[in-house]
Amino acid sequence: FINDKELSDKMSLDISEMEKMLNEYLQFTSSTYSEKNETFDISELIENTINKYSNDNISKELIPRVYMNGRKNLIQRALNNIIDNSIKYAKKINLGLSKKKNNIIITIDDDGAGIPENEYQNVFKPFYKLDKSRGDSKSSVGLGLSITSDIIKSHGGNIILEKSPLNGLRVKVFLPL
């Protein structure tokens, strides 16, 4: 029993964050091994994912009927992680889906504060969190983008960060057709 209420609350929050972090990681690793590849329409998956958010600030430009072979639930999880981050830090979000040569390109732009360019690669490291000033009130365990990157790479793809035309962050996901 801890008498200091502030210390007790902080410890409780830290324990909750650790539990969330472990659950996210366990869920990711178990689905990696159990889910089978299937052919699915990624434009439909993105459309359905966006619709679940019921957010009028998300706009989209998707080419229809783009099929890929992969683990659909993992791809959806990666999309959710990116969109969740955008919603946390931005007001306006644009999602795009295009094809170029043998690649599917998913682009997520937002008008949030963005991430300093020198941090672009760091945010994909497990448990890495940007400094507290970026989002002190935002709950994060530092696994979302790490898991997202692992999912994309496990499908033979790549994920990069850039400055968005909306002045926030642009996340570009490349997946093989």
Write out the residue ranges for each language-model feature.
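Short conserved segment of the HATPase_c
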Residues: 115-128
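Short beta-strand/loop element within the Bergerat-fold HATPase_c
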Residues: 92-102
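Acidic ATP/Mg2+-coordinating residue in the GHKL
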Residues: 110
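Conserved micro-motifs of the catalytic ATP-binding
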Residues: 31-35, 67-70
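Short alpha-helical Gxxx[C/S/T] motif in the catalytic ATP-binding
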Residues: 144, 148
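Conserved glycine-rich
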Residues: 156-157
